[in-house]
Amino acid sequence: MADNGPPGLQFEWDADKAQANARDHGVTFEEAQTVFGDPLSRTFPDPDHSVGEERLIDIGSSTRGRVLMVVYAERHGRIRLISCRSVTRQERRYYEEG
């Protein structure tokens, strides 16, 4: 796992899930890490998918300039990436109106 996130944060993910996400959504988990360095990112809970563990959603700009939605869980002090994709128009508006 590459360390592209902001200093002080540790990331992890399932390698097969990361490969499938890149194939299906055109976004790598390496790029997704960089969203956590966006000071304007917006974070909110994902109660509909929080079965067994709390999942969170972060919408922010990557270092490639793309606004992404990243789904993750916090486990043992690490951020476990679950999925990421480019935002919809409505999600982009939510981010921009911050």
Task: Indicate where each model-derived feature is located.
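Ribonuclease/tRNase effector modules and their secretory precursors
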Residues: 1-98
